[in-house]
Design a protein with these regions (language model features):
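Helix-loop-helix hairpins in multi-pass membrane proteins, especially solute transporters
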Residues: 83-214
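Cytosolic juxtamembrane N-terminal segment immediately preceding the first transmembrane helix
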Residues: 1-40, 54
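Hydrophobic/small/kink-forming positions within alpha-helical transmembrane segments
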Residues: 75-76, 106, 160, 164, ...
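Interfacial helix-cap and linker-helix signal at transmembrane-aqueous boundaries
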Residues: 52-53, 84-85, 169-177, 230, ...
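C-terminal membrane-cytosol helix-exit motif in multi-pass small-molecule transporters
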Residues: 187-205, 220-232, 248-263, 450-458
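12-transmembrane solute porter fold
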Residues: 25-40, 45-47, 60, 135, ...
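Helix-breaking motifs and short loop linkers at transmembrane-helix boundaries and internal kinks
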Residues: 55-57, 89, 110-116, 177-178, ...
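Extracellular/periplasmic helix-loop-helix junction of adjacent transmembrane segments
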Residues: 48-77, 116, 307, 312-317
């Protein structure tokens, strides 16, 4: 048990039910601008890897670490920063993360070698973690309680739109400039979002306990090693490396759970996972994003290598899913303010399972419409699920634990996507060109399991 914990008390600070409209709209602009930048930078670096490898005279395998270090730094620190936000204020973590992200973007743009770029990308990942770890917690305090579902819907809309436009924006920038501009473009937006945030973000309640630094190291090590292990498996690294990383992750997680068994606000939120709705909502989130990871890794290979479509056509075929998610996100938010998330999420994931199964049994020479409507069904199901589930997860946690709940939202998303990508790689290793169909069928299974867990929320208490 940690020694740096004071007696647990209720969170202190202002109690309010959202911001007035005039201030709320500016606060929304601030947090969603930062979220857009952090989400875009997760996607656009992939497009720039060939140019980075050529310009810095490194191999493609080495250049991949530009993506890896960002993801590891991001995932490893989500829970510690979410927990720290409960103590010092979510708005401070957001502003500090945005400042670091903006400065690190300048460092990326000025990088002169792979090593300097990796350092800057690591710092950028830490900054993005500061933004993402408290983003949904801030939404909870910015919107009135009667509109919080809409707020989460807008949040999902921003992420889906960034996910949709990321490759297009990156390709457009690279068509007229060099890869450093992909990072330099963050500077004006980061400065504007920071200035607006300083004026408009609400002060959030402060928890009365000390931050457990050793627990933060354990949490970062646990999640970081898990991502390294899963990612190494996806890239067919040596089995001993994968096994050692995953075992070390489990050991650190076990130590963290033992250390925080009696903690009033544990870094790994064991107290929240004792709430059935929170636990089921987290599990369904991991399942749904694993489906997304399976689909978005396997489908491009299927379209290009099996159907022999061009890269442009592949991009067109991939668009309906995130596009429909972006359309459905605010609609799902409004519905989640009126209807139970268990029903909405269960129906959405059932629809996603149907869409994935239909993609898995595509005919040998499908027409454009045959592909597009199947992708649209997947997007409809995913969008119908995402916002109500986020609302259920956040609402099942007390306001004083919003930071940890927000960290879990982002961690579940990135963990699910990583697991899905690793399983897709495994499917291709086992089945060759049939790997895409196997991955899609596996995704349908994940969605079906998630649907059942979502409906189970109707039978449990808060």
């Amino acid at each position: 048990m940690p020694t740096d914990v004071t007696t647990a008390k209720p969170p202190s600070g202002p109690v309010m039910d959202g911001l007035p409209w005039e201030r709320r709209r500016w606060a929304i602009a601030a947090i969603f601008t930062a979220l857009t930048m952090a989400s875009l930078d997760t996607a656009i670096a992939n497009i720039a890897l060939p140019a980075i490898a050529t310009d810095l005279h490194v191999s493609p395998a080495d250049a991949v670490w530009v993506v890896n270090v960002y993801q590891i730094a991001l995932v490893a620190t989500l829970l510690p920063l979410g927990a720290l936000g409960e103590i010092v204020g979510h708005e401070r973590i957001y502003l500090g993360g945005l400042l670091l992200f903006t400065l690190a973007s300048l460092g990326c743009a000025m990088a002169w070698s792979l090593d300097s770029l990796l350092v800057a990308r690591t710092l950028q990942g830490l900054g993005a973690s500061g933004v993402m770890s408290v983003n949904t917690a801030l939404v909870r305090f910015i919107y009135p309680s009667r509109m919080v579902g809409r707020g989460f819907g807008h949040n999902a809309l921003v992420v889906a739109t960034a996910f949709t436009l990321g490759p297009t924006i990156a390709s457009g920038i690279l068509a007229i400039g060099h890869w450093p501009w992909l990072f330099a473009i963050n500077l004006p937006f980061g400065i504007i979002a920071m200035l607006i945030g300083l004026k408009t973000l609400p002060p959030t309640p402060r928890a009365v306990h000390r931050f457990d630094f050793f627990g933060a190291v354990l949490a970062a090590g646990c999640l970081g090693l898990f991502i390294i292990g899963i990612g190494s498996a996806a890239h067919k690294a040596s089995p001993p490396l994968v096994v050692v990383a995953l075992i070390a992750s489990l050991v650190l997680g076990w130590i963290l759970m033992r250390r925080h068994a009696d903690h009033p606000a544990p870094m790994l939120p064991i107290d929240l996972f004792r709430r059935p709705v929170f636990a089921l909502s987290t599990a369904t989130a991991v399942c749904s994003f694993a489906v997304q990871g399976l689909a978005f890794v396997s489908l491009p290979f299927y379209f290009e290598e099996v159907l022999l479509r061009s890269q442009v056509e592949t991009g067109f075929f991939m668009t309906p899913w995130p596009l429909v998610v972006a359309i459905m996100a605010p609609i799902g938010g409004r519905l989640s303010d009126r209807y139970p998330a268990g029903i909405l999420g269960g129906l959405g994931l059932a629809l996603l399972a149907v869409g994935m199964a239909l993609l898995a049994v595509l005919p040998a020479t499908p027409g454009v419409a045959n592909i597009v409507w199947r992708m649209a069904i997947c997007g409809l199901g995913f969008g119908f699920f995402q916002t109500p589930n986020m609302r259920a997860l956040m609402s099942s946690a007390p306001p004083g634990r919003s930071g940890s709940a927000s960290g879990i939202v982002a961690t579940a998303r990135l963990t699910g996507q990583t697991i899905g990508a690793a399983l897709a790689a495994l499917c291709f290793s086992l089945a060759g060109h049939q790997g895409a169909a196997l991955a899609l069928a596996l995704g349908a299974g994940f969605a079906a399991v998630g649907s059942v867990m979502s409906f189970l929320r109707m039978a449990v208490s808060r």
